[in-house]
């Protein structure tokens, strides 16, 4: 059986043997797509492996484990059905292994959503589980899709943004940096809370919150760990990665910053058996002003909701954390980063009334 090839550009027609179509996922190589590239096949026909073509059955796709499994727990993946998991694992595989084009068969969609909407829905959860899949894939025109016909069958062609070798290099550099940060945790940090405090402190104090000149093509975790600057998703992804690598179950959630009505991302993590919420980007902004209290470290659901509105798809899926690590002696909850709020924080610090700082 011959191998399929890309004809011309990415969006051009693809020649595929009819016998290789049923129940398949197709993924095209990420870099330098030309007419000589092999079409990679994923489906139930394990015989399609000639001339270097890779073949994976559906069960293999469903059973795929992340190359970076130490950085994620799959909190949201555990809440998906089989077809959603099929999409989740396919996009995760493509992202981790360097592919930009995916062809999803119609039978992986349940019909309750528009096709692209369902894919965006699943990728959103993947991006909150994995620090290596950008949150803005589905919000900054990085994701496009259209239905194409192959041998009489319909496939949804998804194109992820092509990022190239530099992206891969920065991702790996950030991963190695994360390993060294986790390895630096002092021996006296022998509980989940102490480990989390140490890592959260590292993130908040070794980065600057920036928006001007920020490119959506950046690698958020590398922006923070390598360059020392990031936006909220860089902070959240880095917390996800570091906490999980330290054995602390962590994921992130998307929503809106209440004070600015802008998109925002926060974390939740399980410390010593209890879930709490975290906003390292907000604490980093306070840190830049000369203060180091953990006003956003270990919030309850209610406290997190004072400054953050969870997106609808997260409101019923995220843990409703009841406990808080915020100091009982603090009579305000910071809901913005205005000068007045920071002034109040300074007064609390000077009075000695606030004891929930990172040390």
Where are the regions that the model predicts?
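N-terminal accessory/pre-domain segments preceding catalytic cores
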Residues: 3-12, 17-190, 305-359
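Short, solvent-exposed coil/turn linker segments
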Residues: 35-38, 112, 219-224, 259, ...
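Short amphipathic alpha-helical segments
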Residues: 115-118, 195, 235
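Solvent-exposed loop/turn segments at secondary-structure junctions
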Residues: 165, 205-210, 230-232, 257-261, ...
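Secondary-structure boundary elements
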Residues: 166-224
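Periplasmic OmpA-like peptidoglycan-binding domain that tethers envelope proteins to the cell wall
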Residues: 222-233
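Hydrophobic/aromatic-rich core segments of domains that either
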Residues: 234-304
């Amino acid at each position: 059986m011959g191998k399929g090839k890309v004809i011309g550009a990415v969006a051009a027609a693809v020649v595929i043997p009819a016998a290789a179509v049923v129940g398949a996922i197709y993924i095209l190589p990420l870099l330098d797509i030309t007419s000589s590239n092999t079409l990679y096949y994923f489906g139930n026909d394990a015989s399609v492996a000639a001339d270097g073509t890779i073949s994976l059955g559906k069960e293999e796709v469903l059973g795929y484990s992340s190359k970076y499994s130490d950085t994620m727990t799959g909190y949201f993946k555990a809440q998906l059905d089989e077809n959603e998991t099929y999409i989740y694992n396919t996009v995760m595989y493509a992202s981790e292994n360097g592919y930009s084009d995916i062809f999803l068969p119609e039978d992986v969609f349940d019909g309750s959503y528009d096709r692209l909407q369902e894919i965006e829905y699943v990728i959103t959860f993947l991006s909150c589980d994995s620090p290596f899949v950008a949150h803005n894939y589905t919000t900054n025109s990085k994701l496009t899709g259209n239905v194409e016909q192959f041998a009489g069958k319909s496939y949804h062609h998804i194109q992820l943004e092509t990022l190239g070798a530099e992206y891969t290099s920065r991702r790996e550099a950030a991963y190695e940096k994360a390993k060294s940060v986790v390895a630096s945790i002092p021996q006296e940090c022998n509980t989940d809370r102490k480990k989390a405090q140490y890592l959260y402190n590292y993130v908040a104090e070794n980065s600057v919150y920036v928006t001007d000149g920020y490119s959506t093509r950046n690698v958020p975790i590398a922006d923070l760990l390598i360059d020392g600057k990031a936006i909220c998703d860089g902070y959240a992804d880095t917390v996800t990665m570091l906490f999980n690598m330290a054995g602390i179950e962590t994921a992130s959630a998307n929503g809106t910053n209440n004070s600015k009505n802008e998109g925002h991302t926060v974390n939740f993590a399980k410390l010593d058996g209890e879930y709490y919420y975290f906003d390292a980007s907000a604490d980093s902004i306070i840190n830049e002003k000369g203060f180091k209290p953990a006003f956003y470290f270990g919030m309850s659901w209610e406290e997190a909701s004072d400054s953050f509105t969870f997106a609808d798809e997260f409101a019923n899926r995220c843990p409703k954390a009841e406990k808080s690590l915020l100091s009982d002696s603090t009579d305000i909850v910071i809901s913005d980063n205005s000068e007045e709020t920071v002034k109040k924080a300074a007064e609390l610090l000077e009075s000695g009334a606030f004891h929930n700082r990172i040390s």
